[in-house]
């Protein structure tokens, strides 16, 4: 896994979005709990609006502190519910691998879009044996590309247009 350090969580979400658009693969970003997680929301919303497959992984306070207004606790799953296809809170380390697998599948299947996985601090520290899928076990949809004839036809239409607009 190649990690790219950014200076702000919003930039992380935007970079993951750009990676997904450029490669056709799922973009991934991570953030700490509380304000770090909420800073991802603008980028996540952009990914939802444009059907970009993205998995955002956020930290969370320990399970025992949930609901106590602990330092940097926020209900990021509720906050992100309207701008993701699905949110997950991983309550056991045994559930982490299958949840990540489901998050990637959800991000890609049907209309692509963002998914958020929230992981409490104590779950992050648990040690378990996990089986992760092989690299090709999660099917990656083929990115459609135009044929040479269709691309030439599109170029001709643009060149012949009096007032072309490219979006």
Regions found by a protein language model. Give the residues of each.
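N-terminal alpha/beta PP-like core and its mobile active-site loop of ThDP/TPP-dependent enzymes
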Residues: 1-167
């Amino acid at each position: 896994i190649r990690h790219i350090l950014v200076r702000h969580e919003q930039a992380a979400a935007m970079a993951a979005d750009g990676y997904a658009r450029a490669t056709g693969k799922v973009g991934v970003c991570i953030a700490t709990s509380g304000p770090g997680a909420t800073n991802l929301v603008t980028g996540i919303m952009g990914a939802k609006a444009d059907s970009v497959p993205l998995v955002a992984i956020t930290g969370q306070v320990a399970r025992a502190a949930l609901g106590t207004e602990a330092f940097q606790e926020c209900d990021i799953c509720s906050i992100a519910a309207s701008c993701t296809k699905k949110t997950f809170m991983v309550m056991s380390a045994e559930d982490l691998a299958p949840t990540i697998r489901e998050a990637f599948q959800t991000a890609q299947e049907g209309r692509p879009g963002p998914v958020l996985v929230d992981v409490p601090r104590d779950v992050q520290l648990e040690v378990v044996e996990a089986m992760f899928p092989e690299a090709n076990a999660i099917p990656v949809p083929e990115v459609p590309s135009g044929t040479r004839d269709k691309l030439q036809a599109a170029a001709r239409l643009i060149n012949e247009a009096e007032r072309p607009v490219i979006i």
